[in-house]
Swiss-Prot record:
Highest classification ranks of the organism: Bacteria, Pseudomonadati, Pseudomonadota, Betaproteobacteria, Burkholderiales
Tagged with keyword ATP-binding: yes
Record's protein name: Putative glutamate--cysteine ligase 2
Listed GO MF terms: ATP binding; glutamate-cysteine ligase activity
Keyword match Cell membrane: no
SUPFAM superfamilies documented for this protein: Glutamine synthetase/guanido kinase
Amino acid sequence: MALETFVNSEPFTFGVELEIQVVNTHNYDLTKAASDLMRLIQGETFPGNITPEITESMIELSTGICHSHEQAVSELHAIRDVLVKAADQLNVGLAGGGTHAFQQWSDRQIYDAPRFQYISELYGYLAKQFTVFGQHVHIGCPDPDSALFLLHSMSRFIPHFIALSASSPFVQNVDTGFHSARLNSVFAFPLSGRAPFVLTWDSFEEYFTKMVNTGVVNSMKDFYWDIRPKPGYGTIEVRVMDTPLSVDRAAAIACYIQTLARYLLTDRPLKLSEDDYLVYTFNRFEACRFGLEGTCVNPQTGERRTIAEDILDTLDRIAPHAAALGSRAALDEIGALAKARVNDASWLRTVFKQEKSLNETVRQQCLRWRE
């Protein structure tokens, strides 16, 4: 199969996708209700889209093409409200969070759609274990070479996105010690990790053709990279974030990525090199394990600092671009998180410490989702 033509899009526009937990309101375990939710929202009017995901206990919402923080917040609230209304009719709950705190993966049911059935047949039990919940952000790019430049420039900031969004400390009744345990599930897939270091679309097309000829992939959907190009949309897609506990947090993180993209493509402050990836996996692990307190190593200088410190320094550098995009409020929220060194994983642990019950913790997650 040939690679799609890259459709040039308006630079620095963005879209947000959120995978949401569907739980019962008895003990707040995951429940099979995605098909019923999809039936109930038919005929409803809302921006963006709502689609099923790989298991019946997940649903995905996505905005349209956004230009500003204000627009993203408005669209996310509108879509969220439609879903909450449908969930109330079914007496089920909806929650953010990168993992469900105590669900058993073997109980999951694959959603009845050809691609999901194919993934289940190909990956076996990993498909059911993939009942994890992420935020994806698309950034518009003016041309394919700019998309690849932005992809590799943005890779240095992957620890920021992981630490800020981290909301998956619990897995199957256990505190994993991680801030984002969700990404451990993603890493099990053979085509996960980082994209190959190529900087021209011609070279990327050659790589894609070679991969197709091996029989390993059929389309870009088969790559589970942390950031991947989406030629049909004219975007790059940042895929490392846990789904936050609120749509407002999701919008703030998306606008941080948007502002960073404008800085990286407009100012071009980085000289890209394969050596940028020498510490990529280490930095990624630190963000997953320790969140904002994790260590971030600069691949060029060897300088070590906390991820929180690196975020605060980055916010200073991109401030003029935040002003141009109207995203100062979003970046103020990001700065407050970095200064306090807290994220949604911190909040979940605090609730569990107080309540001594993961069932109650998930119930409170459902309340957060409505805020």
